[in-house]
C-alpha cells in the first residue's frame, strides 16, 4: 500500500507542477507566487501554526478583485487534478497487483468455495443477478463536459506513464501532452454560462454511455463469465442480462417544468438515433471480421447460399441500421422521414436474432474463438442497452395526477375528486379501470398543467413495450396515487402494462408503505395486471431532510423489511428501487457496505439504484472504473443473497427505535423548531447564491417563495457541504447514541457495531462525514456572514458536532477519525490544504457579494461560482 500511495502522491505532485507552469505562463510570476504563498500558509495552518492561520485569513481577506479569479481557479483546478489521479489509482496496474480486493467477485467465489456453498445454489443466484443503474441528471455535476473530456485524456496519459519500459523520448512526449491538456483546462471557463436544458442533460448521459459503459459492460460480462467458469465450471448463457441501464434524463418531470412531453419524445428519438449510430459502428467492424465461408446447414437454410454467409447477414443489418439512423435524424430535425418504419430496426430482436444465429453457426463449425470475439460483445450490448440505448423512467409528483383527475371530474360534473375520502377514490378508480368506455370527453380543453400530464401519457402510448421502464410517483402516499396513474395511462391508450412505482420519501410515508401496498394488493383488478411483480422506490434524500440521517435510515430499513415480508407472503416478486445519492445525507455510502447493510432477502430480485450527478462520473466515467463498480455491485448482491446478513435481534430493534425517536426530535427541534434556523441557514451557507450556478435544468426549489421545507434535498445538502458543517449528514445521530449509552445500554450499542452491518455502516458513514467537516471553517462563515444574535445557533451546532465526534471515536476505539482507512484519511488531509483557501475565499466573496447585491463586481460573482465548484471537487460527494 505504501508504494501505491507513493505513486499516487508522485502523480499528484507532477500534475500540480504542470498546473504551476501553466499558471506562470498564463498569469505571470506574481500570481503564481501569491498562490504558492497561500498554499504554504494553508499547509502550516493545518499543521497547527496559529500565525500562519492568521496570515492566511489576512491574505485572503485583502485579496484584490483582479486576483480572486486566478487564485480561486488554481486551487479548484488542483483539486480536480487530484480527483483524476485518485480515480486513476483505483484502476492502475499497480493497484491491481498490490491488492486483490476482499470485496471483488473472485474473492467472494473463493470464500463460497471454502464454505462449501452449494454449486447449484450459486449457479442459480448468478443467473438471477441483476444490476440496474438508473442515470439521473440531478444538479450536482459541477464540472462542465468540455472539462470532463480533458480530464479523461489526462487519465489516459497517467496510464501510459505507468509503463516502466518507456524511453526518455516517449515519456517526454506523454508529459508534454499532459502539460498541454492542463493548459487547455486552465484556458477553458469552468463555469457554465447558461443553464443546461433537459435535452443537454440527456446528451451528457448518452455521451457517458458511449464513452464508458459501451466498453465496460461487455468487459464486465467477460470477467463475470471467466469467474463463473473458474469457480463453477460452466459458461454463462449468452442471453444473460445481469446489467441494465435506465435513465431519468428527459423523463423526470418532478418539479421541473422544462421536462415536457415534447422533450421526452425528443430524448427518446435521440436515444434511438445514438443507439443506431453505435451499433452501426460495431456492425461495420464486424462485417470486416466475419469473412468466414463455412456455416451450419440451419444457417444456410435460413439465410440462403452465399460465399461469405456471415457477411451477407451482417451487411443487411448494416443497411437497416443506416436507414434507422436516417429515420431518427429526420425526426430530430423535424423533417418528413425519408424511409418507412418497415425498413428500420425498432426492436432488439431484429438485431439479436440474426447475430445470435451467426454466433451459434460459428460455434457449430468449430470457430468458438471467433464467435466469442466482437460478435459476443455486440450480443451483450444488445442485451444491456438494446436499440433504445437505455430504458426511460417517467417520474411525476402524486398531486399532479390528483389535480388532473379532479379537473376531469369537475368538467363532467362528478364533484371535486381531490376532496374525496381515500376509499371513495379507490372505488371510483377501480370502476373506471374496469370499464371499457373512455372517461375523458373528446372535445374537452384541459388546463395547460393537466394537458401536459395527458400529453406525457400519450407519448408513453406511442412507444413500443419496454421503451419506458416504469412510471415513478414521487411523494406517493396512498393506493389511489398508484391507481390514478394506471387510469391516466389507460385513458391515453397505452396498450400494455407499465410498472407504476410508488416512491415513499418522508418518514411518515415510509412507515405507511406496508399499509398502502397491502391496500393495493387487495384490489383484484390490480393483482390481475401486475402479474405478481411489483417495484417500490425508497427515497433517501427527502426522508433524511425530513427526519435526519439516523431516523431516515431506520425508517428505510423497516419499510424494506416490511415490504419483503408482505410480498413473500403473497407470492409477489418485489424489486426495491433505491433513490440514493452521493452524500451521506442522501443515503450515499461505499457501494459494497451499503448493499450488505440492506435487510435480508431485499436484494434477491436484483438491485435497481439511481446513479446521480457527479457520482456517475466518479463511479462510471471511465471503462475500467465502471467495470470495477459493476464488480463491486455484483459481489455485494451475490454475497447478500448467498451469505445474508443477520436478522437484527429484538434488543437491537428496540435500540434503533429509541435512536430514531431521539435523533428525529433533536433534528426537527433545530431545523423546524428554532425560529432562527432558516435565517441562520441562509446566512451561514451559500444557499441563495447556489441558485445562480447554472448546474442543472431543474429549479432548486419546488416553491420559489418557500422556506427550507420547499428546498430540494440536493441543494439543502450541497449548501451545508460548502460551509463544512455537513449538518444534514449527522445532526441528531451522535447525540441520540450518546443518550442511549448514558442510559446504560453501551454494551448493546457496541455489539450492534460489531455484528450488524446496517449499524456499523451508519457509524462508518458518520466517521467519514466528521473527517470532512471542519468547525473552525464553519465558524469563519458565521463570524463574517451571520448576524451576532444568530451566532448561538452555530456555536451550539459546532459543540454538538465535536461531542458527536468523540462519541463515534469511543465506538470505534480509535483516537483519530478514519484510523482504519489511512489512505482515505491521507487523501482528506491532502485535499484540506487546497480546500481551506477556497472556503476562506468563499467567505470573503460572499461578504462582498452580499454587501451590495445589486451592483456585484463580475469578477466577484465569477470567483464565487468557482469556489463553489472547487469545494465540491474537494469534498468529492457533493449532493
UniProtKB/Swiss-Prot annotation:
Supply the alphabetized keyword list.
Answer: Carbon dioxide fixation, Lyase, Magnesium
Q: Which GO terms describe its molecular function?
A: magnesium ion binding; phosphoenolpyruvate carboxylase activity
EC numbers: 4.1.1.31
Query: Does the keyword Protein biosynthesis feature in the UniProt annotation?
Result: no
Catalytic center residues:
138, 545
PANTHER family under this entry?
PHOSPHOENOLPYRUVATE CARBOXYLASE
**What is the protein named?**
Phosphoenolpyruvate carboxylase
Q: Which organism is it from?
A: Haemophilus influenzae (strain 86-028NP)
Q: What is the lineage of its organism?
A: Bacteria, Pseudomonadati, Pseudomonadota, Gammaproteobacteria, Pasteurellales
Gene that specifies this protein = ppc
Amino acid at each position: 500500500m505504501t508504494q501505491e500511495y507513493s505513486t499516487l502522491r508522485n502523480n499528484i505532485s507532477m500534475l500540480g507542477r504542470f498546473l504551476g507552469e501553466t499558471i506562470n505562463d498564463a498569469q505571470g510570476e506574481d500570481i503564481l507566487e501569491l498562490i504558492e504563498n497561500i498554499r504554504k500558509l494553508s499547509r502550516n495552518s493545518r499543521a497547527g501554526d496559529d500565525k500562519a492561520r492568521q496570515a492566511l485569513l489576512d491574505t485572503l481577506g485583502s485579496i484584490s478583485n483582479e486576483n480572486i479569479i486566478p487564485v480561486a481557479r488554481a486551487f479548484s483546478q488542483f483539486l480536480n487534478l487530484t480527483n483524476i489521479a485518485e480515480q486513476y489509482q483505483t484502476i492502475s496496474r499497480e493497484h491491481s497487483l498490490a491488492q486483490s480486493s476482499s470485496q471483488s467477485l473472485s474473492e467472494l467465489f473463493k470464500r463460497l468455495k471454502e464454505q462449501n456453498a452449494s454449486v447449484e445454489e450459486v449457479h442459480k443466484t448468478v443467473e438471477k443477478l441483476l444490476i440496474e443503474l438508473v442515470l439521473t441528471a440531478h444538479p450536482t455535476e459541477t464540472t462542465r463536459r468540455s472539462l470532463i473530456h480533458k480530464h479523461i485524456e489526462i487519465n489516459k496519459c497517467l496510464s501510459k506513464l505507468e509503463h516502466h519500459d518507456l524511453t526518455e523520448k516517449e515519456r517526454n512526449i506523454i508529459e508534454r501532452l499532459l502539460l498541454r491538456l492542463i493548459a487547455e483546462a486552465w484556458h477553458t471557463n469552468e463555469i457554465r454560462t447558461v443553464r443546461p436544458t433537459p435535452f443537454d442533460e440527456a446528451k451528457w448521459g448518452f455521451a457517458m454511455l458511449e464513452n464508458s459503459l459501451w466498453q465496460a459492460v461487455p468487459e464486465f460480462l467477460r470477467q463475470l463469465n471467466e469467474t463463473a467458469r473458474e469457480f463453477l465450471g460452466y459458461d454463462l448463457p449468452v442471453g444473460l442480462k445481469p446489467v441494465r441501464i435506465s435513465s431519468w434524463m428527459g423523463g423526470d418531470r418532478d418539479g421541473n417544468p422544462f421536462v415536457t412531453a415534447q422533450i421526452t419524445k425528443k430524448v427518446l428519438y435521440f436515444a434511438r438515433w445514438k443507439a443506431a449510430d453505435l451499433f452501426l459502428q460495431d456492425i461495420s467492424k464486424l462485417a470486416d471480421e466475419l469473412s468466414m465461408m463455412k456455416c451450419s446447414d440451419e444457417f444456410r437454410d435460413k439465410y440462403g447460399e452465399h460465399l461469405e454467409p456471415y457477411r451477407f447477414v451482417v451487411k443487411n443489418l448494416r443497411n437497416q441500421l443506416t436507414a434507422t439512423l436516417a429515420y431518427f435524424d429526420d425526426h430530430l430535425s423535424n423533417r418528413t422521414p425519408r424511409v418507412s418504419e418497415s425498413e428500420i430496426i425498432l426492436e432488439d430482436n431484429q438485431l439479436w436474432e440474426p447475430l445470435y444465429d451467426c454466433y451459434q453457426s460459428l460455434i457449430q463449425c468449430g470457430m468458438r474463438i471467433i464467435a466469442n470475439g466482437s460478435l459476443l460483445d455486440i450480443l451483450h450490448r444488445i442485451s444491456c442497452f438494446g436499440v433504445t440505448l437505455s430504458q426511460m423512467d417517467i417520474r411525476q409528483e402524486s398531486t399532479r395526477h390528483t389535480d388532473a383527475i379532479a379537473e376531469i371530474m369537475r368538467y363532467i360534473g362528478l364533484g371535486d375528486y381531490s376532496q374525496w375520502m381515500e376509499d371513495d377514490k379507490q372505488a371510483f378508480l377501480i370502476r373506471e379501470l374496469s370499464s371499457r368506455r373512455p372517461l375523458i370527453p373528446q372535445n374537452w380543453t384541459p388546463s395547460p398543467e393537466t394537458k401536459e400530464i395527458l400529453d406525457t401519457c400519450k407519448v408513453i402510448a406511442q412507444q413500443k413495450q419496454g421503451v419506458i421502464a416504469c412510471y415513478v410517483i414521487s411523494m406517493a402516499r396512498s393506493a389511489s396515487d398508484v391507481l390514478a396513474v394506471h387510469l391516466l395511462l389507460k385513458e391515453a391508450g397505452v396498450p400494455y402494462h407499465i410498472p407504476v412505482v410508488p416512491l415513499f420519501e418522508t418518514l411518515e410515508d415510509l412507515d405507511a408503505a406496508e399499509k398502502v401496498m397491502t391496500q393495493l394488493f387487495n384490489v383484484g383488478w390490480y393483482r390481475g395486471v401486475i402479474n405478481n411483480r411489483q417495484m417500490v422506490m425508497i427515497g433517501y434524500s427527502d426522508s433524511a431532510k425530513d427526519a435526519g440521517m439516523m431516523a431516515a435510515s431506520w425508517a428505510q430499513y423497516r419499510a424494506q423489511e416490511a415490504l419483503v415480508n408482505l410480498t413473500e407472503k403473497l407470492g409477489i416478486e418485489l424489486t426495491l428501487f433505491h433513490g440514493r445519492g452521493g452524500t451521506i445525507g442522501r443515503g450515499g455510502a461505499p457501494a459494497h457496505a451499503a448493499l450488505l447493510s440492506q435487510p435480508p432477502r431485499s436484494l434477491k430480485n436484483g438491485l435497481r439504484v439511481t446513479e446521480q450527478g457527479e457520482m456517475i462520473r466518479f463511479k462510471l466515467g471511465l471503462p475500467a472504473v465502471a467495470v470495477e463498480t459493476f464488480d463491486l455491485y455484483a459481489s455485494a448482491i451475490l454475497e447478500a443473497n448467498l451469505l445474508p446478513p443477520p436478522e437484527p435481534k429484538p434488543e437491537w430493534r428496540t435500540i434503533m427505535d429509541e435512536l430514531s425517536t431521539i435523533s428525529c426530535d433533536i433534528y426537527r427541534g433545530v431545523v423546524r423548531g428554532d425560529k432562527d434556523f432558516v435565517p441562520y441557514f441562509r446566512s451561514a451557507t451559500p444557499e441563495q447564491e447556489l441558485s445562480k450556478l447554472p448546474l442543472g435544468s431543474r429549479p432548486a426549489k419546488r416553491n420559489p417563495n418557500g422556506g427550507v421545507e420547499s428546498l430540494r434535498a440536493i441543494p439543502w445538502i450541497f449548501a451545508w457541504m460548502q460551509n463544512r458543517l455537513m449538518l444534514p449528514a449527522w445532526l441528531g445521530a451522535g447525540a441520540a447514541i450518546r443518550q442511549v449509552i448514558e442510559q446504560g445500554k453501551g454494551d448493546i450499542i457496541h455489539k450492534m457495531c460489531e455484528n450488524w452491518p446496517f449499524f456499523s455502516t451508519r457509524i462508518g458513514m458518520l466517521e467519514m462525514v466528521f473527517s470532512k467537516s471542519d468547525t473552525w471553517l464553519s465558524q469563519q462563515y458565521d463570524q463574517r456572514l451571520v448576524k451576532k444574535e444568530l451566532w448561538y445557533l452555530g456555536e451550539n451546532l459546532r459543540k454538538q458536532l465535536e461531542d458527536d465526534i468523540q462519541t463515534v471515536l469511543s465506538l470505534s476505539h480509535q483516537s483519530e477519525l478514519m484510523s482504519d482507512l489511512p489512505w482515505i484519511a491521507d487523501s482528506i488531509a491532502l485535499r484540506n490544504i487546497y480546500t481551506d483557501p477556497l472556503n476562506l475565499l468563499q467567505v470573503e466573496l460572499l461578504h462582498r457579494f452580499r454587501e451590495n447585491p445589486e451592483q456585484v463586481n463580475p469578477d466577484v460573482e465569477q470567483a464565487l461560482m468557482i469556489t463553489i465548484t472547487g469545494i465540491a471537487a474537494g469534498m468529492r460527494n457533493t449532493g
